Amino acid sequence: MSPSSLSSRTTDQPALAEAETVRLATRHLRAGLTGPLAEAARWGAVPLPVGRFSLHEIHPKRDLALLHAWMNDPAVAPWWELAGDEEVVRRHLATQAVYTHTNAYLGCLDDEPISYWELYRADLDDLARHYPARPHDVGIHLLVGPAARRGRGIGSVLLRAVAELVLRAAPDTMRVVAEPDVRNHASLAAFARAGFRHAGDVELPDKTAALMMRARTARESGARR
């Protein structure tokens, strides 16, 4: 993997064939979780130093080819393990659509799709068996897709922004967590620059992960009142 790549993914989930047919026959990839994370596409655009950033629902017919290209990038494939034909990515999207604690989004800068996101309730995920989870912990996965966008600090800017958006939208959430592979040095550095701290390593079924945490600050806690 190139040190300029940024990606992080959770442990594998089983494919749900019946649900795929139902979900992907719809106009867009429906958010799985009711509540704040399911409304991320309605959070609106936020101005950042790198452009105006916004999250959007994934439309499989429109977005599958793009995501397939990103996942087959040699710098990305070892970390996300979704290389192959479009069916591999389609099944992954279908799985994200049917699990009730996770939501997948396309992230845009100035209306250009440049990132793939998974926001999920970490306390309801298999990950919770491997670390001291707290109620309403939110997990985050990010892939910066275009190679030209990597290695320029964009990933850390986006991670910081999305963590802040999550904490603003979900007042019961006190922590945003991530579990990148310990070998993914670019991802670890991006999370650190975005304000996440390394809370130790955890052994997951498919990797040794660095547990990265971004806790709600005192100022953000005051804003909840």
Show which residues each predicted segment covers.
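Conserved beta-strand-loop-alpha-helix junction that forms the acyl-donor binding cleft
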Residues: 176-188, 205
